């Protein structure tokens, strides 16, 4: 039995076609972006960025995880990220913030995230999710 969804399987098959040279070039490009973001944060004296996790609410059901545009850059750069659930909409679908820290400053990110949770007075989000 195939355990992958069609899109996941297609993505994996495309990945297998990438040559070692192409992979090295992609990784080099990712490293350039990592270095740029690190320098930008340092030069701008930015301890953390706050951004929505997604441009919209979470999708209903388990067919998709939703829109990844708001967090793919952090995956590419390897920056540490903490996601803070901040509420649910009228359909009981969650929305969240992501707090993005700097390289090697995970402890500072934890402190900043705790401060944000306390400032926003976020308690446990009430929901009626049934994952069964």
Predicted feature residues:
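Structural helix-boundary/capping segments
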Residues: 24, 62-63, 76-132
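Short helix-loop capping/hinge segments that flank enzyme active sites or metal/cofactor-binding pockets
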Residues: 1-38, 85-96
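Structural signal for hydrophobic packing residues in well-ordered secondary-structure cores
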Residues: 1, 34, 41, 116-120, ...
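Short, surface-exposed loop/helix-turn segments at secondary-structure junctions
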Residues: 44, 54-72
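Conserved acidic residues
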Residues: 47
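Generic recognition of flexible, low-complexity loop/linker segments
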Residues: 36-39, 69-71
């Amino acid at each position: 039995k195939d355990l992958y969804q069609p899109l996941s399987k297609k993505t994996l098959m495309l990945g297998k076609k990438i040559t070692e040279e192409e992979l090295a070039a992609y990784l080099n490009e990712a490293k350039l972006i990592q270095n740029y973001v690190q320098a930008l944060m340092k030069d701008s004296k930015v301890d953390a960025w706050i951004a929505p996790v997604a441009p919209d609410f979470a999708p209903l059901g388990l067919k998709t995880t939703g829109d990844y545009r708001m967090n793919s850059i952090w995956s590419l750069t390897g920056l540490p990220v903490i996601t803070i659930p901040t509420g649910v909409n009228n359909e009981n679908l969650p929305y969240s913030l992501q707090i993005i820290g700097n390289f090697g400053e995970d402890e500072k990110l934890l402190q900043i995230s705790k401060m944000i949770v306390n400032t926003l007075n976020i308690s446990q989000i009430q929901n009626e999710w049934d994952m069964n």
